[in-house]
From Swiss-Prot:
This is Cell wall mannoprotein PIR3. GO terms for cellular component: extracellular region; fungal-type cell wall. The record marks R67, A68 as: Cleavage. Residues 19-67 form a propeptide. Belongs to the PIR protein family. The PIR1/2/3 repeats are required for the covalent linkage to the cell wall. Their number varies among different strains of S.cerevisiae. Residues 1-18 form the signal peptide. It is found in: Secreted, Cell wall.
Length: 415
């Protein structure tokens, strides 16, 4: 009987301890300030793209410069120099992560990107010729020829107006454009040599429904009576139109970043995309505005861009096994392996643990701003600093090779 009371007390103590769930110790490693209007919980996984602060400040109506961040295996977060245009749910280069949790990115080139049949985006040499696409998905340039000059009886050298190239269809169902010709040079009675206005080459369509532009040629030069040679006006490339009659602008794409096993975030060498391709095979021009629509009377009208007021993220990118995929819950960032996003002792942003790396400065206090950028406390700017072939990401300026950037949140989709 003398043991009954101590046993009851022990049972009550055990019950109360079981009901108490202590916070993870790293959740207290948070900045004192918070970002006004920032959200600390996001319903789906997302990635980040690097946006240069200097570029963003001068591009309200134009495309923003995007740099894909990557994550390598040790959890380090690093940034790429890939750029992509912004529109409603436009696509951007996703950040990649290597196995150690580092987020990294490689430099990109200015050459236009092509896509082969296995979906790889590769850099091609930039040429003046318009691109076509064959059955394996490669984008190739077509050749163009110049029309011969004609002369009538009074000595004038004239040419008829240039017309759009007719569309042909080969046996596998591909609809392709014939080579376009340049407007011939004409000469009137006072000896002036003049050129007709150039027209846009007709678009071609291959078997997957993709509408592509044929190469437009330069208008021939004209010469007025004082001997000056002048250039004729050229016309803009024709827009593409899908089966429902809508004339649309394309979303821009960029190479997705990867994550290696140590958690570092890296991006493979990528190129600036010349055009993007949506699921119906349509190649569209990169724009920041939404595509135009065509109503039944033939008028082309601009469509209004609709944005969910509760969702600050307006960019999407393809998701794959190496893409940095993060979750945000109660101000704590985790990657797909459950590692904690933190600012470590050297001020670098990377993923470790749990728990975070010993000596970590911040491991909580993350949010997404109303502008769609990742923030830590009340700070929404970070720094990409060159480290060999990649950029590491830091919350402070640590050297001459560092540049201020935003980390824009991007929704990840299966492509």
């Amino acid at each position: 009987m003398q043991y009954k009371k101590p046993l009851v007390v022990s049972a009550l103590a055990a019950t109360s301890l079981a009901a108490y769930a202590p916070k993870d110790p790293w959740s207290t490693l948070t900045p004192s300030a918070t970002y006004k209007g920032g959200i600390t919980d996001y319903s789906s996984s997302f990635g980040i793209a690097i946006e240069a602060v200097a570029t963003s400040a001068s591009s309200v109506a134009s495309s923003k410069a995007k740099r894909a961040a990557s994550q390598i295996g040790d959890g380090q977060v690093q940034a790429a120099t890939t750029t992509a245009a912004v529109s409603k749910k436009s696509t951007a280069a996703a950040v990649s992560q290597i196995t150690d949790g580092q987020v990294q990115a490689a430099k990109s080139t200015a050459a236009a990107a092509s896509q082969i049949s296995d979906g790889q985006v590769q850099a091609a040499k930039s040429t003046a010729a318009a691109v076509s696409q064959i059955t394996d998905g490669q984008v190739q340039a077509a050749k163009s020829t110049a029309a011969a000059v004609s002369q009538i009886t009074d000595g004038q050298v004239q040419a008829a107006k240039s017309t759009a190239a007719a569309v042909s269809q080969i046996t596998d169902g591909q609809v392709q454009a014939a080579k376009s010709t340049a407007a011939a040079v004409s000469q009137i009675t006072d000896g002036q040599v003049q050129a007709a206005k150039s027209t846009a080459a007709a678009a071609s369509q291959i078997s997957d429904g993709q509408v592509q532009a044929a190469k437009s040629t330069a208008a021939a030069a004209s010469q007025i009576s004082d001997g000056q040679v002048q250039a004729a006006k050229s016309t803009a490339a024709a827009a593409s139109q899908i089966s429902d009659g809508q004339v649309q602008a394309a979303k821009s794409t960029a190479a997705a970043a990867s994550q290696i096993s140590d958690g570092q975030v890296q991006a493979t060498t990528s190129t600036k995309a010349a055009a993007s391709q949506i699921t119906d095979g349509q190649i569209q021009a990169s724009k920041t505005t939404s595509g135009a629509s065509q109503v039944s009377d033939g008028q082309v009208q601009a469509t209004a861009e609709v944005k969910d007021a509760n969702d600050p993220v307006d960019v999407v990118s393809c998701n794959n096994n190496s893409t940095l995929s993060m979750s945000l819950s109660k101000g704590i960032l985790t990657d797909r392996k459950g590692r904690i996003g933190s600012i470590v002792a050297n001020r670098q942003f990377q993923f470790d643990g749990p728990p975070p790396q010993a000596g970590a400065i911040y491991a909580a206090g993350w949010s997404i701003t109303p502008e769609g950028n990742l923030a830590l406390g009340d700070q929404d700017t970070f720094y990409q600093c060159l480290s060999g072939d990649f950029y590491n990401l830091y919350d402070k300026h640590i050297g001459s090779q560092c540049h201020e950037v935003y980390l824009q949140a991007i929704d990840l989709i299966d492509c």
